[in-house]
Amino acid sequence: MTTTRDYSSPSRAATAARTRRLIVDSAAELFVRDGYVATTMQAIAARAEVSVQSVHLAGPKAAILIAAFELAFAGDEGRHSLTERPALQEIMGHPDTDAVLAGYVRFLTEANKHAAAIVRVMRAASDADPLVRAAFDDLEERRARDMRLGAEWMVSRGLIHESAVAMAADVLGYLTGPDTYLAFVDDRGWTPEWYETWLDRAIRVLILDVY
């Protein structure tokens, strides 16, 4: 009697997942260091110490870049908004408003610390790759929604006027955005801790004291 071998065993799936994560992490390093266009599938394979075929199986280069952002930003792959993250939901539900603001700033600082450089790569690559452009545009739309939800939370706590939600969301998006983080930390040499302190103060002075 012939026995059919199970090729979808948990151990095989775990190995495939580890290989994919290695490929995506290696690609992320190269994308940030060398740029999207200059990073080849062969270079990714060499960095990850896997075959070029394995890299191609992980997806086209655009898909690997998108996965690199998702892993850096959220720790897993998928189209996640900030407001869907359990850690942020817990922070925003705290009854102490000052504690929420401190936790919110800390959360966004960590998110930028891990993902801002990849976002910069995505922005540059979006001019050359339609798949990256679509993913980047989707990211920007989700971020705008998250910022509006942040501003609406401020209204719910009596921190700003309801009529100021749209403008407050725009300012919040600029203050917490990856470009602002990189301008201070990468370009000007700030530490993430300095940025976190500045961001907390900036939100209070430029949003809460104004709107």
Across the structure, where does each feature detected by a protein language model lie?
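Ligand-binding pocket scaffold of soluble enzyme catalytic domains
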Residues: 42-43, 52-54, 68, 130, ...
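Residues in the recognition helix of alpha-helical DNA-binding motifs
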Residues: 58, 67-68, 150, 198
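N-terminal intrinsically disordered/low-complexity leader segments
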Residues: 1-18
